[in-house]
Amino acid sequence: AYEMLGAHPVTQDGQEMWHFAVWAPNARAVSLIGEFNQWDRGKTPMQKVYDGTWEVRLPAKTFDVKSDPKRYDYPDAAKKLTTYKYCIQAQDGTWQDKADPYGFAMQMRPDTASRIYDLSGYRWGDADWMEARKSYDPYHSPVNIYEMHLGSWRRHKDGTFLTYTEIAEQLVPYLKEMGYTHVEFMPVMEHPLDMSWGYQVSGYYAATARFGEPKELMALIDALHQAGIGVLLDWVPAHFPRDAMGLRRFDGTPCYEHPDPRRGDMPQWGTHMFDYARGEVNSFMLSNACFWLEWYHADGLRVDAVTSMLMYDFCREPGQWLPN
């Protein structure tokens, strides 16, 4: 699904373009907004094409500061010009701005916009590891896993985060010295709240901007593989936060969450549960699992909060849940 939805560079009639597509089945209208059009929902309307999907294409130069050097003469203009959201009109006429569920990059919190980002072009150096992995038998091989949270493992003296690059420089020799065969990263997907440690995901396809760019996370995993260390990622397919820019009531109706709060709400966590019975949601989640394995060369996923997906009475009082 991530190959069709989200923002992707394409070529049309010899011209470089960016193609945007979003699933919002019950929306009355959808517009693409961003720094490129002053966040004006009237400037870039999207067209509804099929199965509740909306799309639009724009020339790649639209997102280049060279298109108007005088207008974009301010700090970080090049990066800000890549930001975008979908402005979605619900059936009741109200509008809301949403980050791209399939966006490959997002702004650093507290900002919440998605960013166009071309994931292609990274030159992996872990071919030997990937080939050896095909015949690796974890059931008959020693496994020693180091679980860690990138944001709290180590920091600069002033309390700021290390970058993906800095983590790679320090983590690889540490794991080798301590004899670990694998490292398990707590969620590296984008999330709005530091205190959640990444377990309330807002950008399922976006490597968190706290530590750098997506390709720098690729380089971290690449360095680990070249050192003979496997990489496991914590993955959170059970629930998602209620932040206004996220998946909650995405087009004004429950799209990703179950419409019945007895299935769709997790009272203890203050989050929504995914509606696994919906094909589009299944596609979103299964595609996401494949995405991290394929694009980031992750060696496996540790699935979080499985009990909450299997036991509908988990952390719920009588009357707050429905039986199977």
Predicted segments with their positions:
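Short proline/glycine-enriched turn/loop motifs at strand-loop junctions of beta-rich domains
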Residues: 23-30, 39
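Short, well-ordered turn and helix-capping elements at secondary-structure junctions
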Residues: 9-11, 36, 60, 189, ...
